[in-house]
């Protein structure tokens, strides 16, 4: 995921073409060929995004929700965070760095992230597709956020190689200290599953989405990545500069403990 994030941050037009226009094309094809259901898997980076990946994913959510107004297909989107052990996640990276004798590299020791296991993610995404109503944006309860520094220290301790150093490399462009997933609890409705919530987010009219897509298409055709990034800020109003969000978060957000979240599942 880190490599994908970095590539998209450095290639804004490519990210817009792939994520935004790619989603629009898939929605169009679903309508054309009579698909029954369309479920988008989104990310916590779409909440008040500070990077290109998050902003394009937020635009994708808006496209999917808007399509539900007049479309024949049942549309929904599900948002969740990092998956432990998946390709590109920090655990395989830290494991390799420990095996190589270190150091473990962190962009910032204050970074906090949500995690779930691959089985948890698979189960909840599939279930959210079943319970979602047309046009809904669902949010998964990822449990308590985990401090990446604690995760690194625990992995070093478990490996028995206590001489491994941890080195800060500095935040990457667009990187947040803390990913917002559940937004505000008062903005969420419960579902049949205690771990899945509905966000109270009204879809934009079809014409508004078409205008946003037109604006993005025009600027992308010019071939200027910075102009495309600025246009992305216009069409995704919640797209913030990372320094704004990181300054707000600062030292305020601390997980209650450094253990992995334990969740109770419904039978």
Predicted segments with their positions:
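Strand-loop microenvironment adjacent to phosphate/nucleotide-handling motifs in alpha/beta enzyme folds
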Residues: 32, 62-82, 87-267
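Glycine-rich nucleotide phosphate-binding loop and flanking beta-alpha elements
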Residues: 3, 45, 84
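Conserved Rossmann-fold NAD(P)-dependent oxidoreductase catalytic core, especially the SDR/UDP-sugar
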Residues: 6-61, 66-68, 75
